[in-house]
C-alpha cells in the first residue's frame, strides 16, 4: 500500500495513488509504504531514483548498519515502533530514507518509510497532522513527529502497567491469595514485565535514531530543540521503567512467598 502525503495549508493531505503517473503529478513530503507490492516499490524507485534495500525491515541487521548516509546524500534510519495489543506486545521495524542535500534527485525533501504492517503511531500522526495546522512544515518534521508520538504511545503503555500493578498490589497486601489466583497473577505480571522491557528497549532505539538526526546536522534550530525535548522525555520514561521493574520484582517475590506459605500449610495438614 502506498500512502502519499502532500502539504496543504499547513496540514497533511493523503493522496490516492493508483499508477505511476499519479506520482509524477505530486510534490509530496512523505511517501509511506506499508507492505508495498513489487509494483509499488518499482514505481517509487523509478520515479524518485530511490534505492530501497532488500532487507529494509529486516530484524537481523547489525546496529552499526541501521543509521548511515549514502554517497548520494540519502540518509537511512531503521527504528523500532511499539505495538501494544491486548493479546501481545511487539516491536515493528520501520526503515526511513531521507534526502535533504542532493537537489538533483526527485527524492530531495521527501521522507520515505517502509514497514510491514499497520502501526498505531502512524495512524496517530496522520490524524493529528490533518487536524492541527502548522504541525508539519517539512519531511524532517514528519520523522520527528513520528518519534515524538512513539514516546507518547510508550508512555501510555507504561501508564497501563501502573494501573494493572496497582490492582495486583491491593490483592497482595490483603494477604488472602489462593494458589490458583497467585498463578494467574504471576502470568499477568510476567506479561507486564515483558511489555515494560519492550518499552525500555524501544526507547533506547528511539534515542539512538533521534541522536543520529542531531549529529547529522540535518535539523534547523527549532527542530533541534524538538529533538532535545524528545530525548528529555525518553530520559523521564527510563526512570519509570526502572521503577516498574523494581515493583514487578517485589510483587513476584511476594506472590512466590505466598505460594510457599500455602504449600507449607498443606504439608503440615497431611503430616
Residue ranges and their predicted role:
Residues 1-222, 226-229, 233-243:
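Peripheral, non-transmembrane regulatory/ligand-interaction domains of membrane transport proteins
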Residues 243-250:
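Two-component histidine phosphotransfer core
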Residues 254-261:
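Transmembrane helical bundle of ABC transporter permease
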Residues 262-271:
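Bilayer-spanning, highly hydrophobic alpha-helical transmembrane segments
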Amino acid at each position: 500500500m502506498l500512502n502519499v502525503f502532500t502539504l496543504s495549508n499547513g496540514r497533511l493531505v493523503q493522496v490516492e495513488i493508483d499508477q505511476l503517473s499519479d506520482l509524477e503529478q505530486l510534490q509530496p513530503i512523505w511517501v509511506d509504504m506499508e507492505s508495498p507490492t513489487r509494483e509499488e516499490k518499482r514505481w517509487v524507485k523509478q520515479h524518485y531514483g530511490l534505492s530501497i534495500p532488500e532487507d529494509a525491515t529486516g530484524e537481523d541487521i547489525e546496529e552499526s548498519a541501521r543509521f548511515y548516509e549514502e554517497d548520494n546524500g540519502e540518509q537511512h534510519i531503521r527504528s523500532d515502533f511499539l505495538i501494544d495489543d491486548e493479546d501481545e506486545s511487539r516491536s515493528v521495524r520501520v526503515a526511513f530514507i531521507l534526502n535533504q542535500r542532493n537537489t538533483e534527485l526527485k527524492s530531495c525533501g521527501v521522507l520515505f518509510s517502509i514497514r510491514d504492517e499497520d502501526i498505531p503511531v502512524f495512524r496517530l500522526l496522520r490524524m493529528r497532522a490533518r487536524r492541527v495546522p502548522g504541525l508539519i512544515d517539512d519531511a524532517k518534521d514528519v520523522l520527528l513527529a513520528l518519534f515524538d508520538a512513539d514516546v507518547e504511545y510508550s508512555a501510555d503503555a507504561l501508564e497501563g502497567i501502573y494501573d494493572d500493578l496497582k490492582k495486583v498490589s491491593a490483592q497482595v497486601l490483603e494477604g488472602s491469595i489462593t494458589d490458583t489466583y497467585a498463578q494467574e497473577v504471576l502470568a499477568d505480571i510476567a506479561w507486564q514485565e515483558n511489555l515494560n522491557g519492550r518499552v525500555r528497549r524501544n526507547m533506547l532505539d528511539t534515542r539512538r535514531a533521534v541522536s543520529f538526526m542531531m549529529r547529522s546536522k540535518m535539523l534547523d534550530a527549532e527542530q533541534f530543540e524538538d529533538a532535545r525535548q524528545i530525548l528529555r522525555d525518553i530520559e523521564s520514561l527510563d526512570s519509570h521503567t526502572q521503577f516498574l521493574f523494581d515493583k514487578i520484582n517485589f510483587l513476584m517475590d511476594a506472590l512466590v512467598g505466598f505460594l510457599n506459605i500455602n504449600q507449607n500449610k498443606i504439608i503440615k495438614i497431611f503430616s
